[in-house]
Amino acid sequence: MVTIKNLSFNYGKAGIFSDFNLEIEEGKVTLITGINGVGKSTLLRLIAGVLKPAKGEILFDETMAADPRRHMGFISDTVSLYESLKVSQAIDFHKSVYKIADFDDSLLKRTKVRHDQKIRELSVGQRVIFHLTLILSTHPLLLLIDEIIHSIDVYLRGVFLKELIRLMSEKNVTVVFVNLNFRDIENIVDRVILLKDGKIAVDEEINALKSKVKKVLSDTPPQALPVLFQVDYADHAEYYIYPFKEEYKKKVNGDVVDLDLTAIVNAFIGGEYI
């Protein structure tokens, strides 16, 4: 679907990416994560064409190559689209630009967004739903979602994610998330990419990743095991092992615990706030 080749990008003199490479698979949900400032949102903006790389290229397959932005939806972390317009005016403008005859506003009705409201009067959650509604009207093949969804209330977040699941099921839409809170989306993610220092530190299918990272609770250090990260307490310690193998269970003096995605990512970044 998307191929990033030898990409470099700087903010002023600060280098964010240098000779960066990535393949995004069609029909998959990819999660991009890492500590704040590592370049997650920048990477989405580069894919979306909002930012331009200093060198390298971003290639799209034949279904998108002629006009990538026509087949792509980008929900950024600001959602400031059409703020000065009424909902109805923004819809009309969007329909004229994209030559849309029939506009489905059922999501707007479900979330109490009125056509006579100004965009600036909508809550953050309503703006996200409105933006998603505009995107859906163009029948996107690729959807890029920044971390804005965790700024909206539980109900609207649920509406958003249910619609996303429908899209993936019915339309085989490719989705790329940038995310700091994984509990809402963990069950729909196929692949996890963790960025560190402008490089890919981890790139795993989610089930493979969960099988490879385990927590060992023990009062003695596990011998000759690859400890990724540890947390010390008064009477015991938690050891995060990667890559974990089943045979290691015979070598540990303590319990082996399965981890959710939040705990796994925290282990990789050494417990830093993400």
Which functions belong to the PLM regions below?
Residues 48:
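Helix-to-loop junction immediately C-terminal to a conserved catalytic motif
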Residues 229, 233-274:
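C-terminal coupling/interaction segments
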Residues 78-130:
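ABC-family P-loop ATPase nucleotide-binding domains
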Residues 2, 17-19:
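Conserved structural motif at the start of ABC-family nucleotide-binding domains
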Residues 33-35:
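The feature captures the beta-strand-to-loop junction immediately N-terminal to the Walker
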